[in-house]
Amino acid sequence: MFGVLNSDDRRAAIQQPNILAFGRTSSDLWTSNPTSNYWCETRGNGRDSGQNRVRRPMNAFMVWSRDQRRKVALENPQMQNSEISKQLGYQWKMLTEAEKWPFFEEAQRLQAVHREKYPDYKYRPRRKALPQKSDKLLPAASSSLLCRQVLVDKWYPFTYRDSCSRATHSHMEDQLSSSQPVNIANSLLQQEHHYSSTSLRGSPETLATHLSADPPFYPK
């Protein structure tokens, strides 16, 4: 029994230095691989943080509006930033070239300093994020009803005022509700050709007048 305990103690003592050595090895790998450090620090997104990003040098309008924006914000604390920008843009356009010239000179000086400080700087505009398209589809019932309404409105835009055309319209709706999509398209094309060659030569009012003026026919 004592021999078993001694062997277990020796095995634990051997494993402990191995665990410590593995910890030192993993820490050495962490410090010697800057790519993995950068990936973990940036959470894998590969983008620079806002502190490391180099900003563009200010132009003349930005130099002028830097102080003017504070004044407008203090005078109108309820005004939104977009409204302040619109007002500043209007005021800048109203200035003369002589009034704008000192701000152009200051902007040129700032651009020269920026060029000396960041000689390899290149402006890279940020792309706007595209809105994500919804993958949700309409239910089968609503999509079939919408398709049915579109087909009826497309092929039969005129108003049904007489009893004959009302009956035809109700018959068409029954066909649309009971037929398959391919049969619907074929029947619509055939009936549209028939109506365009016969009943649509005149207006619906003229057609109703003709139907009421003709005497009824009684077979003998």
UniProtKB/Swiss-Prot annotation:
Q: Which GO terms describe its biological process?
A: cell differentiation; male sex determination; sex differentiation
The membrane-spanning stretches of this chain are: none
Disulfide linkage: none
Stored Gene3D superfamilies? High mobility group box domain
Q: Which UniProt keywords apply?
A: Activator, Calmodulin-binding, Cytoplasm, Differentiation, DNA-binding, Nucleus, Sexual differentiation, Transcription, Transcription regulation
This protein's major location comes to nucleus
Which Pfam family, giving just one, matches this sequence?
HMG_box
Record-level Gene Ontology MF annotations: calmodulin binding; DNA-binding transcription activator activity, RNA polymerase II-specific; RNA polymerase II cis-regulatory region sequence-specific DNA binding
Q: Where in the cell is it found?
A: Nucleus speckle; Cytoplasm; Nucleus
Q: Which InterPro entries match?
A: HMG_box_dom (IPR009071), HMG_box_dom_sf (IPR036910), SRY (IPR017253), SRY-related_HMG-box_TF-like (IPR050140)
Q: Which SUPFAM superfamilies match?
A: HMG-box (SSF47095)
Task: List the stretches of this chain annotated as a DNA-binding region.
Answer: 54-122
What is one term from the GO cellular component aspect held by the record? nucleus
Keyword Nucleus present in the record's keywords: the answer is yes
Q: Which domain of life is it from?
A: Eukaryota
In residue numbers, the region (Disordered) covers: 193-220
What family, per the record? Answer: Belongs to the SRY family.
What is known about what this protein does? Answer: Transcriptional regulator that controls a genetic switch in male development. It is necessary and sufficient for initiating male sex determination by directing the development of supporting cell precursors (pre-Sertoli cells) as Sertoli rather than granulosa cells. Involved in different aspects of gene regulation including promoter activation or repression. Binds to the DNA consensus sequence 5'-[AT]AACAA[AT]-3'. SRY HMG box recognizes DNA by partial intercalation in the minor groove and promotes DNA bending. Also involved in pre-mRNA splicing.
Describe its assembly: Interacts with CALM, EP300, HDAC3, KPNB1, ZNF208 isoform KRAB-O, PARP1, SLC9A3R2 and WT1. The interaction with EP300 modulates its DNA-binding activity. The interaction with KPNB1 is sensitive to dissociation by Ran in the GTP-bound form. Interaction with PARP1 impaired its DNA-binding activity.
**Protein name (record):** Sex-determining region Y protein
